[in-house]
């Protein structure tokens, strides 16, 4: 069956996010007022015509399970296929691993039977911590046209030293993969990979047979000369949420009209869990300047350059600037 199948990884801890992920895995982190981080890559997949998506989870999954539910908000609640939540444990435990997976290949090994029943010819692998609006159909077109074994989405925008970086030749082929380098150079990987279903199964089964677990090391680096891996350069807005500071900076960028226009373009809408909150009330004496405000808020004070999630209440006489207020936060009168 032609088309693409989506696999999203949402497991492991990100120490840089601190208390933001104390009770959740990073994919369910609230972002932009109405969304969770996972909504963006999930919407990218749906907008590309992907109707089957598996989400591999491990750890504090309750928030993610509650948010995704049956997948109805993304039109993925289906009798055949649709959204599958995959809290996988068996393979890692059989290798004596306690806690998080050692790597993506081990996580995929946990759901090997699921992979064997994929109906589509191509599979898109992605982390859940990326905020972007990527036209995956273009990635597929480039992948087929190039004849590559795997296409890796990357960007020329600078990242962090711990990220993965690719060097490309003039044909777009990845000739070197490096990570944990002091001075990053090349193209930063966005951790979105497109490859054939049969090749994916072959790679996973080979790693399982040899107790290998790292996608970055055992696939990107070890197989780079044997197979053809191409880079697809995407220089649109792309934010990987890895730290509290990064979360704040990337969130506040949403207050820029050009960023909102790119991220929330009507051609590729971003879907989120439906809610039935009442409309936001802004008192005649209240002040709202350059802010994103979700439904169900009560604004009687002053807010400037802020992002408000649902149910936030700002009492009369309160002044809030340059802040992100999470769900049901109350700012008392006189606070500033």
Give the location of each predicted region.
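Unchanged
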Residues: 1-253
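Left-handed beta-helix
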Residues: 1-10, 198, 206-336
């Amino acid at each position: 069956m032609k088309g693409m199948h989506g696999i999203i990884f949402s497991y492991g801890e990100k120490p840089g996010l601190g208390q933001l992920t104390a009770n959740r895995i990073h994919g369910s982190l609230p972002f932009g007022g109405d969304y969770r981080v996972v909504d963006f890559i999930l919407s990218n997949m749906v907008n590309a015509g992907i109707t089957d998506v598996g989400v591999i989870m491990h750890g504090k999954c309750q928030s993610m399970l509650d948010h995704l539910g049956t997948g109805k908000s993304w039109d993925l609640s289906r009798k055949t296929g649709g959204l599958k939540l995959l809290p996988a444990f068996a393979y890692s435990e059989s290798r004596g691993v306690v806690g998080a997976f050692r790597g993506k290949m081990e996580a995929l090994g946990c759901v090997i039977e699921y992979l064997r029943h994929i109906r589509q010819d191509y599979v898109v692998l992605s982390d859940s911590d990326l905020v972007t609006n990527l036209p995956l159909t273009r990635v597929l077109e480039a992948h087929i046209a190039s004849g590559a074994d795997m296409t890796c989405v990357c960007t020329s925008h600078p990242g962090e030293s711990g990220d993965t970086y690719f060097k490309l030749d003039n044909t777009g082929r990845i000739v070197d993969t490096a990570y944990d380098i002091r001075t990053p150079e090349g193209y930063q990987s966005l951790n979105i990979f497109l490859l054939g279903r049969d090749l994916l199964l072959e790679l996973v089964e080979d790693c399982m047979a040899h107790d290998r677990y790292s996608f970055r090391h055992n696939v990107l680096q070890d197989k780079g000369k044997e197979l053809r891996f191409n880079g697809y350069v995407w220089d649109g807005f792309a934010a990987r949420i890895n730290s509290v500071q990064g979360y704040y900076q990337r969130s506040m960028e949403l207050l820029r009209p050009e960023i909102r226009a790119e991220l929330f373009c009507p051609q590729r809408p971003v879907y989120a869990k439906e809610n039935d909150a009442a409309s936001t009330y802004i008192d005649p004496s209240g002040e709202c300047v350059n802010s994103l405000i979700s439904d169900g808020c009560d604004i009687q004070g002053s807010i400037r350059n802020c992002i408000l999630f649902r149910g936030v209440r700002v009492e009369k006489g309160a002044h809030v600037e340059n802040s992100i207020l999470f769900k049901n936060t109350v700012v008392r009168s006189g606070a500033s």
